Amino acid sequence: MIEMARYQCMCGWVYDEDKGEPSQNIPPGTKFEDLPDTFRCPQCGLGKNAFRKID
């Protein structure tokens, strides 16, 4: 089984690899590192560099 991770933006919003991000057409199971460079936090608009992996 593949371990899915969660990443939290500085604003507090969490990207869950299990769920993806439907509002940006990111399907469930998409790894954070596979997100497009254009990915932005849907809450605050910051890019991938504003996220950190959480337990």
UniProtKB/Swiss-Prot annotation:
Gene Ontology terms for molecular function: electron transfer activity; iron ion binding
Cofactor(s) of this protein: Fe(3+)
Database matches in InterPro entries: Rubredoxin, Rubredoxin-like_dom, Rubredoxin_dom, Rubredoxin_ET
Cofactor note: Binds 1 Fe(3+) ion per subunit.
Binding-site residues, Fe cation: 9, 11, 41, 44
Gene3D superfamilies: 2.20.28.10
Any Pfam family: Rubredoxin
Alphabetical GO biological process terms: alkane catabolic process
Transmembrane stretches, start-end: none
Keyword Metal-binding: yes
Physiological role: Rubredoxin is a small nonheme, iron protein lacking acid-labile sulfide. Its single Fe, chelated to 4 Cys, functions as an electron acceptor and may also stabilize the conformation of the molecule.
Record protein name field: Probable Rubredoxin-2
Naturally occurring in which organism (per UniProt): Methanocaldococcus jannaschii (strain ATCC 43067 / DSM 2661 / JAL-1 / JCM 10045 / NBRC 100440)
